[in-house]
């Protein structure tokens, strides 16, 4: 089954690329990793990871979708499948491929044929009511990440209300609050990846 493919989606500016950078930085010594990024007309996210990340350039492929970013990860994911095939040809021992979607709205989801697990990233600056508004990314993702909690006091967001709304929207599905600038919540996400996707014997549960 290797490598495990993990989709990371969310609106523009929510912190998807930064999350990929932090996950690869924290996990690269223990796992063989690669990344695919999706942008409409550029390879800017891939270039950011090459410049600021820990992985060599040949482990990062930037896909230019040329259209709706949602289509490239669901209805017509052929370019992403080609990138996955290329990475598997380059590196036969990969453990994880992160597939980052282009910035999209709350309706974005990954094809289950493309990824084994789906992490959806929102941020508190988008508004306190985002979890309540729902959408497939919020309600159906395997893990919901609520990022930029450090901004909550400045944008008048009540994290307790966001927590309750996330619980209502997601039922038993887990979610985690993060402050990626300070690394808060990253280890919880890694523990979830190890336990739920890599099927390692972990004991920690995602907490809010």
Swiss-Prot record:
Facilitates the functional incorporation of the urease nickel metallocenter. This process requires GTP hydrolysis, probably effectuated by UreG. GTP binds at residues 10-17. It comes from the Bacteria. Its main location: cytoplasm. The keyword GTP-binding applies. One of its GO terms (molecular function) is nickel cation binding. One of its GO terms (biological process) is urea catabolic process. Belongs to the SIMIBI class G3E GTPase family. UreG subfamily. This is Urease accessory protein UreG. It is found in: Cytoplasm. Keywords: Chaperone, Cytoplasm, GTP-binding, Nickel insertion, Nucleotide-binding. One of its GO terms (cellular component) is cytoplasm. Disulfide bonds: none annotated. Homodimer. UreD, UreF and UreG form a complex that acts as a GTP-hydrolysis-dependent molecular chaperone, activating the urease apoprotein by helping to assemble the nickel containing metallocenter of UreC. The UreE protein probably delivers the nickel. It comes from Halalkalibacterium halodurans (strain ATCC BAA-125 / DSM 18197 / FERM 7344 / JCM 9153 / C-125). InterPro entries: CobW/HypB/UreG_nucleotide-bd (IPR003495), P-loop_NTPase (IPR027417), UreG (IPR004400).
